[in-house]
Curated annotation (Swiss-Prot):
Family: Belongs to the TRAFAC class TrmE-Era-EngA-EngB-Septin-like GTPase superfamily. EngB GTPase family.
Name of this chain's protein: Probable GTP-binding protein EngB
Gene name in the database record: engB
GO biological process: division septum assembly
NCBIfam families listed in its UniProt record: GTPase_YsxC (TIGR03598)
Keywords of the record: Cell cycle, Cell division, GTP-binding, Magnesium, Metal-binding, Nucleotide-binding, Septation
Superkingdom of source: Bacteria
Pfam families noted in UniProt: MMR_HSR1 (PF01926)
Native species: Acinetobacter baumannii (strain ATCC 17978 / DSM 105126 / CIP 53.77 / LMG 1025 / NCDC KC755 / 5377)
Ranges where the EngB-type G domain occurs: 13-188
UniProt keyword Cell division, yes or no: yes
Residues engaged in binding Mg(2+): 28, 50
GO cellular component, one term: cytosol
Record-listed GTP binding positions: 21-28, 48-52, 67-70, 134-137, 167-169
Length: 211
């Protein structure tokens, strides 16, 4: 199910883990890799079509993955940005079934302003957070591990005890680790197929695909 605003979301019950990140962090690609559904989030040249809250039931309707609108909203009017940001804030603040975040950051540009805001907000709400440094295939192993260590050190300075890993949806780096995290929170395995209507899913922006 997809909803443009909090008031139209599925019933606020059960347990939800939301995927959040900038519009170019590879969020849709990560969800596709995790659920083994190549067309779950489809590419579009119209960024506005992805700015909805998308719910995916994992067999049990009370356990859901949630695909949140990417923040950053490049190349869209300012008034549209404000509307999207307001609805995203409403979900993050008021959604009682939201229990955790998977926060995606491009490994080449980690800990941007909005990322820091999301981390601080999640901490204030006592949510668990698992961070994916996406597009790790863009760096060699040494530089990628260096960024991972630097981000871990920054989180430690902020006194944020959040888990973090390298991830690439292109070569499936870190996929099993991510699935293990999901299994610890939801009844999820890589072989499990989520229940959803593909045709009901709004198309994703080009910026949300792996570059």
């Amino acid at each position: 199910m997809s909803a443009p605003k909090l008031a139209l979301c599925v019933e606020d019950s059960g347990y939800e883990i939301a995927f959040a990140g900038r519009s170019n962090a590879g969020k849709s690609s990560a969800i596709n890799a995790l659920t083994n559904q190549k067309q779950l989030a489809r590419a579009s040249k119209k960024p506005g079509r992805t700015q909805m809250i998308n719910f995916f039931s994992l067999g049990n309707p009370d356990q859901r993955l949630v695909d949140l609108p990417g923040y950053g909203y490049a190349a869209v009017p300012e008034d549209m940005k404000r509307v999207w940001q307001k609805e995203l804030e409403n979900y993050l603040i008021h959604r009682k079934s939201l229990q955790g975040l998977v926060l995606l950051m491009d490994i080449r540009h980690p800990l941007q302003h909005f990322d820091m805001m999301m981390l601080e907000w999640a901490y204030s709400r006592h949510l668990f957070v698992h961070i994916l440094l996406t597009k790790a295939d863009k760096l060699n192993r040494g530089p990628a591990n260096k960024v991972l260590l630097e981000v871990k050190q920054q989180l430690k300075k902020m006194k944020l005890d959040f888990s973090i890993q390298l991830f690439s949806s292109l070569n499936k780096l870190g996929l099993e680790e991510l699935a293990s995290v999901m299994a610890g929170r939801l009844h999820f395995t890589l072989e499990q197929q989520p229940e959803f209507d593909v045709d009901a899913i709004p198309e994703a922006s080009d910026e949300d695909a792996e570059e």
